[in-house]
Regions:
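Flexible, low-complexity linker and terminal segments
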Residues: 1-13, 17, 22, 208-254
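Active-site-proximal loop->helix
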Residues: 111-116, 136-150
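Short, hinge-like loop/turn segments at secondary-structure boundaries
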Residues: 71-74, 117, 142-146, 232-235
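Thiamine diphosphate
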Residues: 1-135, 198-202, 209
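Glycine-rich beta-alpha junction loops
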Residues: 59-61, 131-133, 189, 218-225
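Conserved thiamine diphosphate
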Residues: 15, 142-209
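Structural motif
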Residues: 52-55, 95-98, 123-127, 171, ...
């Protein structure tokens, strides 16, 4: 029997977004990237922007994002995604333009590009995946690594006197005049996924309505980098990440 014969249209309650193709994802088990990709695809389809969306992919775990979502993509040099997005949006103001970046790409090497694009009020959206570690390169300390959190480059835990404090880029973004909507969400549960999708939708709509820059941070896990099972990683995130990176809207300029 075919899939269509097994699952009748009248009984179908959920299906994969059309924009997500059948390529096998390279992400580790338990990774949040796949869920966020799905949310982005759903929002784009619901907005009817399938043929008018440009994503800017980063250097990092999501470097191959263009293999999974059938929209127009542009690869950017490490940390320069907001600058590339600025150019694309200014050339094509009718396009929905977003960047998809991790904490290393956005908060470390790309800090300048991020801050200045947001401060200028560019009509773009930044999707920021914060798992507090460098996942692609083997689990090194990131700018967002928590105090006391261990990594391959701080095996005894992040030391404030040696490494400084974790950088809360989302709080900084909320203080900038050019930002319209700044939110921090997660995708570790069904209610959280629904809230994250709502935040992404609002950010994308703001971008298309010329309200200014938008940033949606997704606090995430990295089972491989944290050396935990997906289940333990989710629990650790709730107990340690959420208190330092509290969820919710930080700014909503109506």
């Amino acid at each position: 029997m075919t899939k269509e014969e097994i699952i009748k249209p009248e009984n179908l309650v959920y299906k994969k977004p059309t924009l997500m193709n059948d390529n096998a994802m390279h992400y580790c088990p338990g990774c949040s990237h796949g869920v966020v990709h799905k949310l982005i695809a759903e929002v784009i389809e619901e907005m009817g922007m399938e043929d008018k969306t440009v994503g800017i992919s980063p250097v990092g775990c999501a470097v191959f994002a263009y293999n999974y979502l059938d929209i127009d993509w542009q690869e950017a040099a490490h940390g320069r995604a907001p600058a590339v997005a600025t150019a694309v949006k200014r050339l094509w103001p009718d396009r929905l333009v977003f960047t998809y970046q991790g904490d290393g790409d956005l908060v470390c090497i790309g800090t300048a590009e991020t801050i200045h694009a947001l401060n200028r009020g560019e009509n773009i959206t930044i999707i920021f995946i914060n798992n507090a570690i460098y996942g692609m390169t083997g689990g090194q300390m990131a700018p967002t690594t928590l105090v006391g959190m261990k990594s391959s480059t701080c095996p005894y835990g992040r030391d404030v006197e040696l490494h400084g404090y974790p950088l809360k880029i989302t709080e900084i973004a909320a203080q900038l005049e050019g930002t319209a909507y700044v939110s921090r969400q997660s995708v570790q549960s069904v209610p959280a996924i629904r809230k994250a999708k709502k935040a992404i939708r609002k950010a994308f709509e703001n971008s298309m309505n010329g309200k200014g820059s938008n940033l949606v941070e997704i606090v995430s896990t990295c089972s491989s980098g944290w050396k935990m099972t997906p289940e333990k990683a989710n629990k650790w995130m709730e107990e340690h990440m959420f208190p330092f990176y509290p969820l919710g809207d930080l700014k909503d300029k109506e």
